[in-house]
């Protein structure tokens, strides 16, 4: 059978439909391609924004860390300025603020302990002295724990306990003695040229050498064994302190007190008077001079 004849109008209509179909397919393809490009653009933009955000965040963190470090340095320097003038009430708040940022900084903890000892010296009430002393001791222990290779940090507990001794009950005095020796030994193992450590060791030996056998026996029965000290070793310890740092009056006065305990009165007067003639340069110098005068009065 022959196909039915197609009129010119029908033929034109079919041609238009084919064009429309072909055009629609092309348009759909173009739209699909456009959508793919848009999607890729969005992904790239999101990735770029994320990276920019990450870089900006890191930069801000670095700025914050740098600012914090700078802030701590500024606080400590301001604190040192007050400390040089023995103004503990002004130095302490600055150091405590710095501690919030660096709670494990041994040098800072040593400085804080020192300010509490300064306040302890200024306090008129023994109860208040002990309260401040225990705070200083806590910071001293923390300094020692955070600075195992720091001489000043290891020595801090010994200095604080020595400052507290006159106000402690007898039982605690006995318990403190081996702790002081342990602290000094650790400090000297780190720095054998620490005049502070030799001074404290000399005082430790002098005080314990003064305890009679009878008192030592009774103390051992009631409070526990008391370490033994040597007055001869005390003399050598203090001479080492002077040789290392001859500019501190406390070394001379303490050596004079050692000689007084040994019965060597002329040498006692010589060294105590030498210390008394030197200018006050440290917070405890007036207190040290007073002890020297009391010793002279008994000679």
Protein language model features and the residues they cover:
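N-terminal leader/linker segments that initiate helical-solenoid repeat arrays
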Residues: 66-102, 106-121
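C-terminal/domain-terminus segments
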Residues: 249-287
């Amino acid at each position: 059978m022959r196909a039915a004849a197609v009129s010119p109008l029908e033929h034109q209509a079919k041609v238009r439909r084919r064009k429309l179909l072909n055009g629609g397919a092309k348009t759909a393809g173009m739209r699909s391609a456009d959508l793919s490009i848009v999607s890729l653009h969005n992904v790239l933009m999101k990735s770029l924004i994320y990276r920019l955000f990450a870089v900006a965040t890191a930069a801000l963190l670095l700025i914050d860390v740098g600012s914090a470090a700078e802030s701590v340095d500024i606080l400590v320097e301001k604190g040192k300025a007050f400390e040089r003038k023995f103004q503990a009430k002004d130095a302490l708040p600055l150091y405590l603020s710095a501690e919030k940022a660096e709670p494990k900084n041994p040098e800072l903890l040593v400085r804080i302990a020192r300010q509490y000892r300064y306040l302890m010296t200024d306090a008129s009430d023994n109860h208040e002295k002990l309260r401040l002393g225990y705070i200083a001791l806590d910071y001293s222990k923390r300094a020692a724990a955070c600075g195992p290779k720091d001489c000043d940090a290891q020595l801090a507990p010994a200095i604080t306990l020595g400052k507290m001794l006159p106000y402690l009950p007898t039982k605690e005095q006995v318990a403190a003695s081996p702790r002081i020796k342990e602290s000094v030994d650790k400090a000297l193992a780190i720095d054998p040229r620490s005049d502070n450590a030799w001074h404290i060791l000399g005082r430790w030996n002098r005080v314990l050498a003064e305890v009679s056998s009878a008192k030592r026996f009774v103390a051992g029965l009631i409070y526990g064994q008391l370490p033994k000290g040597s007055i001869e070793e005390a003399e050598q310890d203090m001479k080492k302190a002077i040789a290392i740092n001859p500019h501190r009056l406390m070394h001379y006065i303490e050596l004079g007190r050692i000689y007084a305990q040994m019965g060597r009165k002329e040498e006692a007067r010589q060294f105590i008077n030498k210390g008394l003639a030197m200018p006050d340069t440290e917070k405890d110098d007036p207190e040290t001079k007073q002890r020297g005068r009391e010793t002279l009065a008994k000679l």
